Amino acid sequence: MDKQLADTFTQLSQQNGVVGYCCVDESGLCLKAHGNKQSSNAGFYKSLLDKSKFLTQSGEPANIVIETDTANIFIQQNDKITLSVSKLP
């Protein structure tokens, strides 16, 4: 899995507009982060996805987009890994 994560982070770093990313495990602990305040928000991202399960009929976590004046944050869960990506608006 480490190779797969490393490849994903390399691809993210090469995309235009990406200013940060954070990978979180199923306990809410930061596995890897890059960018401003990404690691300090790791538990928050995981908590948001856990709460989003109550908003869907299937009980699956929703994909979340947070839009601000300075960045758009995309949060998604795949298997047991939560990934957030911050991009310029």
UniProtKB/Swiss-Prot annotation:
Keywords: Cytoplasm, Lysosome. InterPro entries: LAMTOR5. It comes from the Eukaryota. SUPFAM superfamilies: Roadblock/LC7 domain (SSF103196). GO terms for biological process: cellular response to amino acid stimulus; negative regulation of apoptotic process; positive regulation of TOR signaling; positive regulation of TORC1 signaling; protein localization to lysosome; regulation of cell size. Belongs to the LAMTOR5 family. It is found in: Cytoplasm; Lysosome. One of its GO terms (cellular component) is Ragulator complex. The keyword Lipid metabolism does not apply. Regulator of the TOR pathway, a signaling cascade that promotes cell growth in response to growth factors, energy levels, and amino acids. As part of the Ragulator complex, may activate the TOR signaling cascade in response to amino acids. Pfam families: LAMTOR5. This is Ragulator complex protein LAMTOR5 homolog. It comes from Dictyostelium discoideum. Gene3D superfamilies: Dynein light chain 2a, cytoplasmic. Its main location: cytoplasm. Part of the Ragulator complex. The keyword Cell membrane does not apply.
